[in-house]
Amino acid sequence: MLPRLVLCLMLGWGSVLPAASVPELVLNNVNGPPYTNAQQTGFLDRVGPAAFHRAGLRLRLVQLPAERGLRDANAGIEDGDLTRIAGMENNYPNLVRVPEKLVDWRFSAFTNRHDLSVPAHWASLLPLTVGIIRGWKIAEVNLATAKKIVLVDDVDQLFRLLEKHRVDAVVYSREMGLWYRQEHGLRDVQLLEPPLESREMFIYLHKKHVEHVAPLAAALRAIKQDGTYARLYRDSMPYPLGGGP
């Protein structure tokens, strides 16, 4: 029989090694509150690691400008990107999409011009000067023929364009824009309804991690089926799942 000390050490090592050997993937994150925040209590701060854990992985998020994040993920500097629309692999061939949506984004217009008509689609913004975040490909493509596009690197710069009256409208996620407006007391900024477009958002991994794509998709489906996804949404988001204020 092994001495008790040796046995305890072996058991201790056995409990440490699996955790230490779990692969960690670093993904770029272009989200803001209420999806992700500095305290890591946002919806995607919680549902992302939950899915990765079920797939036998650890997730660490870093926040880079959207365009740089895509380039770095495609180059393998980071291991992927947390939320992008389908089709990114067409222009970033080293990225592989996890074929189970992570979340829905409602791309919306915000303005402090009270004379603007309500947009029902991207074409309604084409006669305007519009601010968008560099690297948000859906906005870059749909507004390519707009009167003028002003590109910025982050949400603070985006809404500053409105404050300085440099643009007629900006495009952002509906939920994140509403949170930002409330948090920063932007009383003159209004959300234009309905949203320009609702799109499914997906995790992308660099092709060197292709073996994790199927397990991650299965893990996402599992946490939706067992109620974990809906519970984390209720606990983290100020708006009902599939709804809004």
What does each model-identified segment do?
Residues 33-50, 112-146, 160, 175:
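Bilobed "Venus flytrap"/periplasmic-binding protein-like clamshell domains
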Residues 136-150, 221-245:
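Ligand-binding clefts/hinges and TM-proximal coupling segments of bilobed small-molecule sensing domains
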Residues 62-126, 135-138, 193-195:
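Acidic, polar ligand-binding/catalytic clefts
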Residues 45-54, 113-119, 123-129, 203-239:
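Extended ligand-binding regions for polar small-molecule ligands
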Residues 67-79, 144, 155-175, 183:
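Short helices/loops that flank or line small-molecule/ion binding pockets
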Residues 20-94, 132, 152, 216, ...:
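Extracytoplasmic small-molecule ligand-binding "clamshell" domains
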Residues 29-30, 103-108, 182-220, 239-245:
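Periplasmic-binding protein-like
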Residues 83-93, 168-190, 194-197:
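A ligand-binding cleft/hinge motif common to bilobed small-molecule-binding domains
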